[in-house]
């Protein structure tokens, strides 16, 4: 899985002509401004056009601005307001940290690389930027999977105890540790070098460099394995979990107005989390599909607008980094109240969870028996 700005580059096995295609667009064998004998002027790739670059600058800057503000706000309210410090919200804050990493460390350099056509940010960032984006995406995927499994365990099986806050911190730490290990090839197998396109003209390249004689096959294996393990499989688990949760909530009959209100809160929270997963899956699908096409058929690299297509799909994928805070504010009243309180610089958030605490504080565990059948009894906790 080739993450970030360097995913649009070919590997170290490219010929000079192929590197020239990357730099100046398909069909070019001369420097910009020069014409081959008896040839017509050729259009360089669209990312070199000023109007396209303006659109790309606006798109990336908007994503960065919205992402930094929104994700910082999510982290702030979870840390500041005690009533927001629930296990689910800790996982949501972890998603925000991962997205913030992409917004601040990856996207500015992605934009710079796209506009300049070569890597001008030095060898350290050559290794760090693709690694950071791969790390963040993998952390997000693991966290979304953990949230789905936790809610499935509590709602479908009516378990009395949820994950404790201490265990949630351990899970978050493990998510970052496992992701750091899985993303490490993106930093290790990379080379920062000068490549001579034509005599007396060099560009700075940051390319994949896999070991062994069959270098290309290792990159393909890693890319396909990452796609399966960190996209297809987790989304399968998440889809299964939320399908069962949705079925359980839809078919449940609540005996009493108080519990019915609590049940509705769970439905709303589940809807919000499902939307987060859908946005993540849909936004990343075009980029994953396009990269899969490249891995299967390298001739895709010969497309005239390959770089523009990759960049557009990358922008779509990055929209997920600012969409989550918008979903929280739109679909969850607790986050909406917390955001407003943060803007007003309020120190407390007394209103939050008030409807839950008043009704259920005296009934931390509510035993419900449906149709007087012992097999239908279950226990609900108040932490939504």
Swiss-Prot record:
UniProt xrefs under InterPro entries: GPCR_Rhodpsn, GPCR_Rhodpsn_7TM, NPY2_rcpt, NPY_rcpt
GO molecular function: neuropeptide Y receptor activity
Extracellular side: 1-54, 111-127, 190-219, 293-307
GO cellular component, one term: plasma membrane
CDD domains: 7tmA_NPY2R
Residue pairs linked by disulfide bridges in the UniProt entry: 126-206
Residue numbers with lipid attached (S-palmitoyl cysteine): 345
Pfam families in the record: 7tm_1
Lipid bilayer topology: Multi-pass membrane protein
PROSITE patterns per record: G_PROTEIN_RECEP_F1_1 (PS00237), G_PROTEIN_RECEP_F1_2 (PS50262)
Residues annotated as transmembrane: 55-75, 90-110, 128-148, 169-189, 220-240, 272-292, 308-328
Cytoplasmic topological segments: 76-89, 149-168, 241-271, 329-384
Alphabetical keyword list: Cell membrane, Disulfide bond, G-protein coupled receptor, Glycoprotein, Lipoprotein, Membrane, Palmitate, Receptor, Transducer, Transmembrane, Transmembrane helix
Membership in a protein family: Belongs to the G-protein coupled receptor 1 family.
Protein task: Receptor for neuropeptide Y and peptide YY.
PANTHER family, sorted: NEUROPEPTIDE Y RECEPTOR, NEUROPEPTIDE Y RECEPTOR TYPE 2
Name of the featured protein: Neuropeptide Y receptor type 2
């Amino acid at each position: 899985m080739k993450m970030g700005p360097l995913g649009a580059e070919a590997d170290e096995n490219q010929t000079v002509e192929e590197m020239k295609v990357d730099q100046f667009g398909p069909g070019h064998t001369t420097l910009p401004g020069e014409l081959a004998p008896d040839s017509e002027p050729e259009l360089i790739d669209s990312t070199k056009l000023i109007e396209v670059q303006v659109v790309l600058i606006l798109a990336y800057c908007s994503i960065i601005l919205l992402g930094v503000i929104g994700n910082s706000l999510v982290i702030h309210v979870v840390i500041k307001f005690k009533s927001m410090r629930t296990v689910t919200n800790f996982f949501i804050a972890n998603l925000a940290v991962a997205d913030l990493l992409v917004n601040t460390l990856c996207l500015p350099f992605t934009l710079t690389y796209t506009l300049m056509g070569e890597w001008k940010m030095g060898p350290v960032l050559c290794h760090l930027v693709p690694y950071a984006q791969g790390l963040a995406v993998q952390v997000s995927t693991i966290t979304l999977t953990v949230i789905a499994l936790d809610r499935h365990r509590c709602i479908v099986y009516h378990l009395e105890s949820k994950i404790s806050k201490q265990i949630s911190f351990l899970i978050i730490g493990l998510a970052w540790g496992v992701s750091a290990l899985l993303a490490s090839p993106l930093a290790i197998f990379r080379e920062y070098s000068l490549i001579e396109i034509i005599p007396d003209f060099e560009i700075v390249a940051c390319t994949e460099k896999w070991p062994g004689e069959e270098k290309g096959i290792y990159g393909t294996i890693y890319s396909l394995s990452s796609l399966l393990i960190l996209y297809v499989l987790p989304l399968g688990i998440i889809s299964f979990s939320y399908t069962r949760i949705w079925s359980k909530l839809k078919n449940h009959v609540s005996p009493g107005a108080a519990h019915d209100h609590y049940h509705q809160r769970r439905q709303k929270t589940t809807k919000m989390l499902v939307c987060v997963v859908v946005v993540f899956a849909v936004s990343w699908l075009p980029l994953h599909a396009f990269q899969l096409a490249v891995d299967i058929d390298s001739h895709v690299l010969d497309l005239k607008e390959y770089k523009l297509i990759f960049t557009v799909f990358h922008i779509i994928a990055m929209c997920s980094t600012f969409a989550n805070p918008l979903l929280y504010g739109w679909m969850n009243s607790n986050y909406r109240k917390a955001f407003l309180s943060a803007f007003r610089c309020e120190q407390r958030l007394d209103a939050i969870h008030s409807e839950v605490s008043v009704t259920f504080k005296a009934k931390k565990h509510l035993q419900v028996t449906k149709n007087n059948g012992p097999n239908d009894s279950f226990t609900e906790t108040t932490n939504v």
